[in-house]
UniProtKB/Swiss-Prot annotation:
Subunit structure: Heteromultimer composed of HisG and HisZ subunits.
Source organism of this protein record: Chromohalobacter salexigens (strain ATCC BAA-138 / DSM 3043 / CIP 106854 / NCIMB 13768 / 1H11)
Pfam families for this protein: HisG
Reaction(s) catalysed (UniProt annotation): 1-(5-phospho-beta-D-ribosyl)-ATP + diphosphate = 5-phospho-alpha-D-ribose 1-diphosphate + ATP
GO molecular function: ATP binding; ATP phosphoribosyltransferase activity
Name the record gives this protein: ATP phosphoribosyltransferase
PROSITE patterns assigned to the protein according to its UniProt record, in alphabetical order: ATP_P_PHORIBOSYLTR (PS01316)
EC number(s) stated in the UniProt entry for this protein: 2.4.2.17
CDD domains (alphabetical): PBP2_HisGs (cd13595)
């Protein structure tokens, strides 16, 4: 196994909140992501590289060993499954909630509750645990439209401020899970590169703790 460490980072908001933590842990990209079309980036450390990919792909890259370490939202990990992954650290960034939601005051109109979501596995598990028969419909965006068009009775989606729900006459209902970004590590890498990964995890943990104290 290569001595090089590959870190897989999620694009977007998670990336912007991860970079300061990495900097506090001593890892900084050698160039600006926004000004490059590269996919694999050098860092200030010669044996550490970064890849910036879609959030949904991070668990796969880490699970299959293409990356040693990754940063992904808990929602993505719940949907993907955690086989082959360690989850040693809650980075406490990109916080939100994974919830059910529906039109204010509306009752289900379908014999089997119709649920629109991109979190198909999460939704199936949740409704089964509640003893509710549900037909889960996979959508990729604009979840709030599904109940308005009578495509679904409820949705399962990420809720941050709840403003989009309210703007469409909807309300959050049941909390499925609290979501934040997590550090995940390939199990084989954790064994073979333990001497490299343990200090990194510890430094990131210290950065998270310092950030928490600053915000208190």
């Amino acid at each position: 196994m290569s001595k090089q460490l590959i870190l897989a980072l999620s694009k977007g908001r998670i990336l912007q909140e991860t970079l300061p933590l990495l900097a506090d842990a001593g890892i900084e990209p050698a160039e600006d992501f926004g000004k490059s079309r590269k996919l694999l980036f050098d860092t200030n450390l010669p044996d550490v590289k970064l890849v910036v990919i879609r959030a949904v792909d991070v668990p796969t890259y880490v699970q299959m060993g293409a990356a040693d370490v990754g940063v992904a939202g808990k929602d993505t990990l719940l949907e993907h499954g955690a086989e082959g992954l360690y989850e040693p650290l809650d980075l406490e960034i990109s916080r939100c909630k994974l919830m059910t939601a529906g039109i204010v005051g509306a009752e289900p109109t379908h014999a089997r509750r119709r649920v629109a979501t991109k979190f198909v596995n999460v939704a199936r598990r949740y409704y089964a645990q509640q003893g509710i028969q549900a037909e889960v419909i996979k959508l990729y965006g604009a979840m709030e439209l599904a109940p308005l068009m009578n495509l679904a009775d409820e949705i399962v989606d990420i809720v941050d401020t709840g403003n989009t729900l309210r703007a469409n006459g909807m309300e959050p209902r049941e909390l499925i899970d609290e979501v934040s970004s997590r550090l995940v590590v390939n199990k084989a890498s954790m064994t073979m590169k333990h001497d490299r990964l343990k200090p990194l995890i510890e430094r990131l943990g210290q950065a998270v703790a310092s950030r928490r104290e600053t915000q208190a």
